[in-house]
């Protein structure tokens, strides 16, 4: 027989989840569900800034932590985003990792693996094509007014050998994950950089890649 306390806790959880579902039409549930549920259960995000009550704002922000920007609308703490205009898959955050281990990354991505990730390789020239067009645009439009535009010297205009096609190898994890977990996972496999899409898809970028890998989401269980 269930105790009254357990029944009350279950009812409270159901009520909180129903309230969340009602107020999170534009919410990125794939990314935010776990953390939002935790904060709601702890009753740290119950106030409504839109109605002039921000008594819990600080506690709610601390609870959501690094996911505040992406998830504050899920708990009614900020204005809802219109994801139809800018879908999360079209935006991403990139960062270089300070201590890559190229030999480890190559070893983990050689041949077929039964792990929960997808290995994708493509020509470095393809990786750079979008960036090259952007740099050319910046250099030619209103040139007298843009003398201070800086262009990275280690990729676009550097000599590029066509004797052997260089390949950029990246790894997409199958499941959604937080940006913090994405960074840790890519570090643990020796990647040089990582790209975290705002739908929570994680891409680890190998040492042969010149820029930041692919801009296309290819996480099997985290596509939207």
From Swiss-Prot:
It is found in: Secreted. Transmembrane segments: none annotated. GO terms for biological process: regulation of BMP signaling pathway. Keywords: Developmental protein, Glycoprotein, Secreted, Signal. One of its GO terms (cellular component) is extracellular space. The keyword Secreted applies. Glycans are attached at residues 53, 82, 148. Residues 1-26 form the signal peptide. Pfam families: Tsg, Tsg_N. It comes from the Eukaryota. The keyword S-adenosyl-L-methionine does not apply. May be involved in dorsoventral axis formation. Seems to antagonize BMP signaling by forming ternary complexes with CHRD and BMPs, thereby preventing BMPs from binding to their receptors. In addition to the anti-BMP function, also has pro-BMP activity, partly mediated by cleavage and degradation of CHRD, which releases BMPs from ternary complexes. May be an important modulator of BMP-regulated cartilage development and chondrocyte differentiation. May play a role in thymocyte development. Belongs to the twisted gastrulation protein family. The N-terminal domain is sufficient to interact with BMP4. Interacts with CHRD and BMP4. This interaction enhances CHRD/BMP4 complex formation. Interacts with BMP7. This is Twisted gastrulation protein homolog 1. It comes from Gallus gallus.
């Amino acid at each position: 027989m269930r105790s009254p306390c357990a029944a009350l806790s279950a009812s409270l959880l159901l009520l909180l989840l129903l309230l969340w579902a009602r107020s999170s039409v534009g919410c990125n549930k794939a990314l935010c569900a776990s953390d939002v549920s935790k904060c709601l259960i702890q009753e740290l995000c119950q106030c409504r800034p839109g109605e002039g009550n921000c008594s819990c704002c600080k506690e709610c922000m601390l609870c959501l932590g690094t996911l505040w920007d992406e998830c504050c609308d899920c708990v009614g703490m900020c204005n809802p985003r219109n994801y139809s205009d800018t879908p999360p898959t079209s935006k991403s955050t990139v960062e270089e990792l300070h201590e890559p281990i190229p030999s480890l990354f190559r070893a983990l991505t050689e041949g077929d693996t039964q792990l929960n990730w997808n290995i994708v390789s493509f020509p470095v020239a393809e990786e750079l094509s979008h960036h090259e067009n952007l740099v050319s645009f910046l250099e030619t439009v209103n040139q007298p007014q843009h003398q201070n535009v800086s262009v990275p010297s280690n990729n676009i205009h550097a000599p590029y050998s066509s004797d052997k096609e260089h390949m950029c190898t990246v790894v997409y994890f199958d499941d959604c994950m937080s940006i913090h977990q994405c960074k840790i996972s890519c570090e643990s496999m020796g990647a040089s950089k990582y790209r975290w899409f705002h739908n929570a898809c994680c891409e680890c970028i190998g040492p042969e890649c010149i820029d930041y890998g692919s801009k296309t989401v290819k996480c099997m269980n985290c596509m939207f």
